[in-house]
C-alpha cells in the first residue's frame, strides 16, 4: 500500500487502499458484462484470469507509489473483509475518477456514497480545483451520480468502450 493513500470511511463504507491481496476478490467480481461494458476499451474483454492481479501489480500500485493515483477497494463497514467494488482518483487533465460496484451490491447507493467521500478527498485534502469524469453516454447510473454531485456536461466526443461506441 502506498503511504499517500489513506483509508476513508463513510456511514456505511470503508474505502481501503488496494493491495495485491485484494486481487482474488476483485477478479471474482469484476469480469461481468454489466460492470465492464461502460469502461474504456483498453480494459481487455474477455477479462483474463489474472487481469486483476496484473492491473494491481503493474498499473495501480505503481501509480499509487508515484503519487499519480489513488485506488481504493470499497467495503461495507459491517463486512470489511468483503470487497464489493473499487474506486479510483487520478491526477491529470483526463479522466480523474472511475469506479465499479459488484452486481450484488448495485442499486443501494454505495457508489454514490463512495463518490461523495472521494469528492471531499479530491477537493479538501488534495486541493484540486476541478474533477473530470468521463462516461459512456448510455451509462445512466453513473450519469445520475455525477448530476447529484452538481457536475455538468462540458463536452461530448466519440469514444470506444468495452461495449462499443
Residue ranges and their predicted role:
Residues 1-38, 71-165:
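Acyl-donor (CoA/ACP) binding surface of acyl/acetyltransferases
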Residues 63-67:
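Soluble sensory domains of the PAS superfamily and closely related sensory modules
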Residues 36-58, 70-72:
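Conserved GNAT-fold acetyl-CoA-binding loop/helix
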Residues 2-4, 58-62:
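Short, P/G- and charge-enriched loop/turn segments at secondary-structure junctions
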Amino acid at each position: 500500500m502506498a503511504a499517500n493513500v489513506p483509508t476513508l470511511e463513510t456511514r456505511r463504507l470503508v474505502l481501503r487502499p488496494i493491495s495485491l491481496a485484494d486481487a482474488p476478490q476483485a477478479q471474482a467480481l469484476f469480469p461481468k458484462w454489466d460492470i465492464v461494458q461502460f469502461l474504456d476499451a483498453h480494459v481487455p474483454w474477455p477479462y483474463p484470469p489474472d487481469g486483476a492481479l496484473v492491473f494491481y501489480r503493474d498499473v495501480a500500485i505503481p501509480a499509487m507509489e508515484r503519487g499519480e493515483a489513488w485506488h481504493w477497494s470499497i467495503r461495507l463497514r459491517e463486512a470489511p473483509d468483503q470487497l464489493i467494488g473499487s474506486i479510483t482518483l487520478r491526477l491529470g487533465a483526463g479522466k480523474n475518477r472511475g469506479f465499479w460496484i459488484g452486481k450484488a451490491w448495485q442499486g443501494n447507493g454505495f457508489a454514490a456514497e463512495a463518490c461523495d467521500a472521494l469528492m471531499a478527498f479530491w477537493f479538501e485534502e488534495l486541493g484540486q480545483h476541478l474533477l473530470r469524469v468521463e462516461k459512456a453516454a448510455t451509462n445512466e447510473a453513473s450519469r445520475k451520480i455525477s448530476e447529484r454531485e452538481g457536475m455538468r456536461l462540458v463536452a461530448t466526443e466519440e469514444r470506444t468502450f468495452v461495449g462499443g461506441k
